[in-house]
């Protein structure tokens, strides 16, 4: 399954707020619609499917990529669900987004693909590159690169940066301090339901 490129508002109307996909928030539905939908019995499969879709659309990854991350998480020590979230959060495109260097994860992926991003002073153009503690993230010292970063930083300041990252706004340097803690994921998600969804495939 390919990466979604359709209307983003349609997705957040169905799944709720997904800051990685879009900064927009879903409009509240009229009460009569909420009453009619709440009276329907929702299957457990659909609940798990929607949690899985939240991860896919928020992080902007394909079905195949998500399944791959689930398989890696299953082999790691610790809670499979939490390891899965940590793997997704440590992707370079997500780190760029969480540092406020891009307005969304798709925007961050563009920065990486177009070679605007340096990790430890080396150009990295792979959005799925897995960052690790003590990695230093910078934007290339080119006018276009710096302008893209500045526009995003100006609009992102109100959200703040999670505690596993640091950004020096004077030198424009981001630092990965540690692996992210579950409390700082910033996405309303039940990761255990995602693991259950893939229980027969992973």
UniProtKB/Swiss-Prot annotation:
CDD domains: S4 (cd00165). It is found in: Plastid, Chloroplast. One of its GO terms (cellular component) is chloroplast. SMART domains: Ribosomal_S4, S4. It holds the Pfam family Ribosomal_S4. SUPFAM superfamilies: Alpha-L RNA-binding motif. GO terms for biological process: ribosomal small subunit biogenesis; translation. Signal peptide: none annotated. Gene3D superfamilies: Ribosomal Protein S4 Delta 41, Chain A, domain 1, RNA-binding S4 domain. Residues 90-158 form the S4 RNA-binding domain. InterPro entries: Ribosomal_uS4, Ribosomal_uS4_bac-type, Ribosomal_uS4_CS, Ribosomal_uS4_N, S4_RNA-bd, S4_RNA-bd_sf. GO terms for molecular function: rRNA binding; structural constituent of ribosome. Keywords: Chloroplast, Plastid, Ribonucleoprotein, Ribosomal protein, RNA-binding, rRNA-binding. One of the primary rRNA binding proteins, it binds directly to 16S rRNA where it nucleates assembly of the body of the 30S subunit. Belongs to the universal ribosomal protein uS4 family. Part of the 30S ribosomal subunit. Contacts protein S5. The interaction surface between S4 and S5 is involved in control of translational fidelity. HAMAP family: Ribosomal_uS4_B (MF_01306_B). This is Small ribosomal subunit protein uS4c. It comes from Anthoceros angustus (Hornwort).
